[in-house]
Amino acid sequence: MLIAQRPTLTEEVVADNRSRFVIEPLEPGFGYTLGNSLRRTLLSSIPGAAVTSIRIDGVLHEFTTVPGVKEDVTEIILNIKNIVVSSENDEPVVMYLRKQGPGVVTAADITPPAGVEVHNPDLHIATVNGKGKLEVELTVERGRGYVSAQQNKAYDTEIGRIPVDSIYSPVLKVTYKVEATRVEQRTDFDKLIVDVESKPAISPRDAVASAGKTLVELFGLARELNTAAEGIEIGPSPTDAALAADLALPIEDLDLTIRSYNCLKREGIHQVGELVARSEADLLDIRNFGAKSITEVKEKLAALGLSLKDSPADFDPSLVTDAYDGDLDADYADEQYN
C-alpha cells in the first residue's frame, strides 16, 4: 500500500463572500484532478433557491406594462431574476411584494415566509409613480444549476402566472491554479489554490464543504466495485504525528521536580500519554502528590499544548504565581521513604 502525506486545507478570507483555499501537498498531478473536479461541482451542483415564477396583479403575460409603473413587465422580470434568496423548505413557497406609490420598489419590500430569506434587500425591482401600485406573488423553489423559464413552465399553469429563468447556484465564480511545492527533498508535489466567490446565501467555506461531500458520495460508487482494491492511502496529518510524538515522550522529558517524578513513577505513569489520561482527582489520590505538584504537571503539559483529562485546554501557566519553588519540603524525606 502506497502511503501519501495527508494534505492540509487552509482558508484565507479575501473579502465578504470570497475566500481562497489552499490544499497541499498533493501527489504530482492530483492538483489539476482535484481542482477541476471542485470547480465544476461548485459551479453546477451546489443546492440553492431561486424564484421560478411570478404573478403580477392585473397582468396576464410578460409582454405588457403595469399601470403607474415605470418599468415594463419584461424589465421587472429581469430584476427579479437577480434576487438572492435562500430557503429551508423542500417544497415551493410563496413570497409577496406589495408597494403603493410613489416610490422605488426594492427587494426589501418583499415579505418572505418562515424559512426563507432575501439576501440582497437593496436590489432595485421597479419604480412606482404617485397613483401606481405593484403587487407581485413570487414562487421560490430549491434546486441546482440553471433552469430556463421554458422548463419552469407547467402545463397546468394558471392564467397570469409567468415562469422565469432560475439560477439556483449560490456560487458566482471559481478559479484555481496549481503550483509546485516541496516535501522534504522532492519539489514536484502539487499545491492547489482555489478561489471561490459566492452569493450572500452561502459562505465559500460551506460551498466547498458541500462540493467535497458530493464528490465523496459519487467517487464512493467506484470504490464499491472492489473495496479491497489497492490505492494510495492518506497518512496521518503533521499535527496528528506531532501529537503522537508528544504523547510518547517519557515523563523524564518533562523535567519535573524529584517529588512529582517519583510519585508518578511509583504509580506506573511512564509516558506523557499515560499522564494526560489522568484527571486531577486521580493524581491527588497518589500518596504525597499535592496541589503544588498538580500545578507543576499542568504547567509542563501546557508547554506541549496538552492538559489533564478534566483540565481546560487553555490553561495559562503565566497566570500561576508561586506554583512551586523547586525546593524540597522539610518533610520530603519522610514522605518519600517512610
From Swiss-Prot:
<dbReference type="GO" id="GO:0000428">
    <property type="term" value="C:DNA-directed RNA polymerase complex"/>
</dbReference>
<dbReference type="InterPro" id="IPR036603">
    <property type="entry name" value="RBP11-like"/>
</dbReference>
<comment type="similarity">
    <text>Belongs to the RNA polymerase alpha chain family.</text>
</comment>
<dbReference type="GO" id="GO:0046983">
    <property type="term" value="F:protein dimerization activity"/>
</dbReference>
<keyword id="KW-0808">Transferase</keyword>
<dbReference type="InterPro" id="IPR011263">
    <property type="entry name" value="DNA-dir_RNA_pol_RpoA/D/Rpb3"/>
</dbReference>
<dbReference type="InterPro" id="IPR011262">
    <property type="entry name" value="DNA-dir_RNA_pol_insert"/>
</dbReference>
<dbReference type="Pfam" id="PF03118">
    <property type="entry name" value="RNA_pol_A_CTD"/>
</dbReference>
<dbReference type="Pfam" id="PF01000">
    <property type="entry name" value="RNA_pol_A_bac"/>
</dbReference>
<dbReference type="InterPro" id="IPR036643">
    <property type="entry name" value="RNApol_insert_sf"/>
</dbReference>
<keyword id="KW-0804">Transcription</keyword>
<dbReference type="GO" id="GO:0006351">
    <property type="term" value="P:DNA-templated transcription"/>
</dbReference>
<dbReference type="GO" id="GO:0005737">
    <property type="term" value="C:cytoplasm"/>
</dbReference>
<feature type="region of interest" description="Alpha C-terminal domain (alpha-CTD)">
    <location>
        <begin position="243"/>
        <end position="338"/>
    </location>
</feature>
<dbReference type="InterPro" id="IPR011260">
    <property type="entry name" value="RNAP_asu_C"/>
</dbReference>
<protein>
    <recommendedName>
        <fullName>DNA-directed RNA polymerase subunit alpha</fullName>
        <ecNumber>2.7.7.6</ecNumber>
    </recommendedName>
</protein>
<comment type="subunit">
    <text>Homodimer. The RNAP catalytic core consists of 2 alpha, 1 beta, 1 beta' and 1 omega subunit. When a sigma factor is associated with the core the holoenzyme is formed, which can initiate transcription.</text>
</comment>
<dbReference type="GO" id="GO:0003899">
    <property type="term" value="F:DNA-directed RNA polymerase activity"/>
</dbReference>
<dbReference type="InterPro" id="IPR011773">
    <property type="entry name" value="DNA-dir_RpoA"/>
</dbReference>
<keyword id="KW-0548">Nucleotidyltransferase</keyword>
<feature type="region of interest" description="Alpha N-terminal domain (alpha-NTD)">
    <location>
        <begin position="1"/>
        <end position="226"/>
    </location>
</feature>
<comment type="function">
    <text>DNA-dependent RNA polymerase catalyzes the transcription of DNA into RNA using the four ribonucleoside triphosphates as substrates.</text>
</comment>
<dbReference type="Pfam" id="PF01193">
    <property type="entry name" value="RNA_pol_L"/>
</dbReference>
<keyword id="KW-0240">DNA-directed RNA polymerase</keyword>
<dbReference type="GO" id="GO:0003677">
    <property type="term" value="F:DNA binding"/>
</dbReference>
